[in-house]
């Protein structure tokens, strides 16, 4: 599925092999100040509006996640959301090190269940997401970082660069 965002509408297109779903395309009127649940990661980094000030809570309409709509076989819908930024910073330890972070939460209510996203975002630029969780059990932590010309490092000899990030190289593809 994909969502194309315009100032007043969001066009959602999906393709499915499930019975009674097939291919679908629909336009949803976009309320002022609304955002997509799928855009919460860039929202937490300050790249998507609205941007709550420190200690502020904002109510917003949030378009349900394309991922969750797909997995639950239900149409996307505008849900009620509460966006909050913590009033101060805290220090967070993850495998990649220790970071001073801001904590942001997004509560999404409605559909087939409410969920809460929590983001620990590096306080200083570039405002990397250091950790994020979702109330359904998703928990992601920054394992490592490297500022590299990665587009040049795609051969077998760069295998150790992958391992240095705490990741395992993918197995070779089979024919």
How does the language model describe each region?
Residues 31-65:
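N-terminal trafficking/processing presequences and adjacent post-cleavage segments
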Residues 1-28, 57-175:
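Acidic, serine/threonine-rich low-complexity disordered tracts
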């Amino acid at each position: 599925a994909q969502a194309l965002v315009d100032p007043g509408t969001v066009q959602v297109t999906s393709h499915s092999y499930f019975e009674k779903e097939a291919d679908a395309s629909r336009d949803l009127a976009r309320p002022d100040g609304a955002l997509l649940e799928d855009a919460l990661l860039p929202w937490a980094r300050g790249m998507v509006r609205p941007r709550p000030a420190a200690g502020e809570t904002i109510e917003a309409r949030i378009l349900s996640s394309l991922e969750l709509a797909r997995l639950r076989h239900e149409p996307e819908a505008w849900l009620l959301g509460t966006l909050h930024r913590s009033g101060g910073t805290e220090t967070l330890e993850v495998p990649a090190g220790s970071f001073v972070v801001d904590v942001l939460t997004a509560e999404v209510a409605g559909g087939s269940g409410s969920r809460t996203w929590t983001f620990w975002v590096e306080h200083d630029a570039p405002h990397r997401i250091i950790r994020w969780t979702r109330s359904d059990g998703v928990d992601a932590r920054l394992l490592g970082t490297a500022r590299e010309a990665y587009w040049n490092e795609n051969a077998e000899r760069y295998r150790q660069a992958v391992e240095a990030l705490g990741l395992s190289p993918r197995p070779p593809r089979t024919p």
